[in-house]
């Protein structure tokens, strides 16, 4: 494999590296504020949202990552995943607060459920498929450079969100905030149709569940300490 990455590959790396991290900034730093300030002041709902989204992200990455390996395909999961990820983020724009205690609790539960749905799509597209694609299209000679660029993206994403979008939340304009971020994420899916090239992987062999458990084998862990 060539050690030099082409412009199309770099375009995909930068696009998904940035757009994906922008979406994760919203999930990690703004959903709890949105839930507390506009839906319910019950902090137990925030704790539930954080816990369930973490579980969803972990399980999804394992299950969908193994599915991607099994199918030998990355592009479809990345493109469709980003499109649905963006739609699920934009859907938060249409959740409204109710003055009734029972309705407010139901709305808070809905936010928690939708956060898990959003996390499922995000973990499928970014954590499982995109990260695997990065490994597929790089080699040890250039992987360090690529990983360095991607490691910077969370900081760039925070600067973009805080600099360009945080004012919307301060003004209480959550609807526009979520629609913009959802649109950016969907745009990533659209661009993926043009930027992402399938690495041409063979279909995975063996049992699907055996592939999921493969990474937990002590011998595999000892053989891959980093």
Label the model's feature ranges:
Residues 80-105:
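C-terminal ends and interior cores of transmembrane alpha-helices
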Residues 56-58, 144-169:
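Glycine-rich segments within core transmembrane alpha-helices of 12-TM secondary carriers
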Residues 70-84:
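Cytoplasmic membrane-interface "Motif A"-like loop-to-helix N-cap segments
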Residues 183-202:
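C-terminal membrane-cytosol helix-exit motif in multi-pass small-molecule transporters
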Residues 1-54, 226:
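Helix-loop boundary and gating motifs at the non-cytosolic
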